[in-house]
Amino acid sequence: LSSENRGARAIAEAFGYSGDDLASIPAEANMGLSCGNPTAHASLRPGETVVDLGCGGGLDVFLAAAKVRPEGRAIGIDMTPEMIERARRNAAKGVDGKPYSNVEFHLAMIDKLPLAAGSVDCVISNCVINLAPDKQAVFREIARVLKPGGRMAVSDIALKKQLPEEVSSDLLAYVGCVAGAILIDDYDRGLRDAGFDPVEIIDTGSDLNVYGEHETEAAGRSANATSGVLPIATAGCCSPDAKSARSLYELLRRYNINDYAASVKVYAIKPAN
């Protein structure tokens, strides 16, 4: 699956990636798994170290690498060997045959990062934190690795109100980055409890029904895409296989998911002292 797949490209463009963004990275890095473009609002600067939680094929890592320039570092974290392998292949391939020199990828859980405390300028993530079983542990780990004054700029799914039972209990909705989400107020409170201040969570107004409209096109996954710790394990966030995608579409068609959930931009700063 790549930017050459119509569904993957449509989802990426619906959530903030421009044609130039997608053309500037290896096509296989875009797997149609987005709910926003965190690099667009992270204010990344040359020389910074940025970490992407749940990097998948490396889409946001490669975009971040261009912004921090060769003197900076872009680090991808993913829980599955398949995704790390894919990301490393993409990094070696690069664009126009020129490999990336300032990226690295690590196999790890996002609540147990293989990074030193106070070593990171910015943490980004795209439609992944909502899938974490212990979100508070993730928030604490982000705070640990950030430098004083460091920031997080995350694109995620959060709830405006509680989901209907049929949706919240359905694993397919979980794979679709919906049922794992928490209320916006709980997201805000969790970050503040982890020590972040200020915190701002903004509803982007993006249409979440795009998942149902394009998921069956973007779900060109291998047969083992649902064989791991969770169905998201090898496929990444927001990415059921084609058969599951059709079931997800049928489920979400019975509801206007925009009434319950939102694609949000999350900004938070670790106090300087």
Give the ranges of each region predicted by the language model.
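Hydrophobic beta-strand segment of the Class I
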Residues: 50, 123-124
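A short acidic, Gly/Pro-enriched loop at the edge of an enzyme's catalytic core
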Residues: 111-122
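Class I SAM-dependent methyltransferase SAM/SAH-binding core
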Residues: 45-112, 137
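Conserved alpha-helix/loop element of class I SAM-dependent methyltransferases that forms part
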Residues: 5-49, 60-67
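Short alpha-helix
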Residues: 180-201
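Short, glycine-/aromatic-enriched active-site segment of Class I SAM-dependent methyltransferases
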Residues: 158-178
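A short glycine-rich, Lys/Arg-flanked "PGG" loop and its adjoining helix->strand segment in the class I
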Residues: 136-151
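C-terminal lobe and adjacent flexible extensions of AdoMet/dcAdoMet transferase-like proteins
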Residues: 2, 194-273
